Structure formats: C-alpha cells, structure tokens
Amino acid sequence: TNPPFSLFREYIKQLVDYDKKFLIIGNMNAITYKEVFPLLRDNKVWLGNNYKVNAGAMFFEIPEKIANLEQVREVKTNESGKKVYITRVQGIRWFTNLDHGRRHEPLQLMTEKEVIKFTTKKPFEKYDNYDAIEVSLVKNIPSDYKGVMGVPVSFLDSYNPDQFEILGSNRGVDQDPNKIYGKGSYLNGKEVYKRLFIKHRKK
C-alpha cells in the first residue's frame, strides 16, 4: 500500500535503510526534500517509467460513496455493471529503485548555438549567485555545454544517469553543490523557481 504523502519522507527513508526494492507514488515536490534529494542525486532512487504519460498526472478509481463529483474526471461502467469514478491527480510521480529501460534513453539535444538560433534567440544567462547558466526548458539543454546548468525539476522525467550528473539544487545549503548559498538562485536580481544543477558526463 502507498502511505499518505505527509509520511513520504519517513517511508522512503525506511525502505532505503532496510535495502528494500520499491515502487511508490509521491508528490513531485518531494524531489527537493532534504531526505529525498540526496537519494536522487546519488542514483539510489529515480522516477518510474510512465512519468511522461498524461503530462505528469495519474488517474485513480475512487469509491462512489466518497466521490466528489466536481473532481471526477470520468465515469465508466465496469464488467459487473457498476459505475467507476475516475479522478485525475496532477504533479505526482512513481519513485523507485527498480531499473528500467527508459531511464537509460539518451536525451536528444541541440548544441548551444542551435538552441540560441532556433529557440531562445539570445545567449544563456548566468545566475547572480551560482556559477551556472539558467536553462528554463529541458529541451533547451545544450548538448555541448561543459559547465553547470540549472534546470527545472521536471528534468528528472528525462534524466539519464549515463548522460548527466546531478550536482545539487537551489533549495538549501545542504543541496548547494558549493555549500555556500541557501535557498534560491537569482537571475538579474529575481529569484527563479526550483532548479536542479546538472552537467554532462564526460564521454
């Protein structure tokens, strides 16, 4: 069974501490929890293989007696003739330590020059307080950039540990790769949203 998200930190720690194989559901925000992020960074835990389906949402059957009709996405009839209420939950993922093929699919990317020419129309900017460039969309990660890049947490949906190394995040000193700054990374004086810091693995 899957515990409530409020117990996610304790539950995943227990599974890892006892060296269990697992496949559990958690909120996308759990990625930057101080108890969870090191597991993702060190490739002890990763996302499951159906994360790209339905734009990161999952569908669940809910009992009729507790169904909130405003949240019901679809009503079906099963083989027994009973109504089945389907609800859609956004922003959740499978977290697992079971390997799967999609985890090793290389992300197809353009070079830095190609990204600037065809997409951004301007050079990548560096953070005010990190020696890294801001890449706001995963598809714009330059294939030939050798330094550190700040990317959205949704990068983990496409993360290939053979292609990239996760260095840290901007959610706290314990996750900052340089152990200097606290929460937040800034671009032209404005704080950007949650970011992971990554770089290409040397070939």
Mark where each language-model region is:
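Class I S-adenosyl-L-methionine-dependent methyltransferase catalytic core
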Residues: 4-203
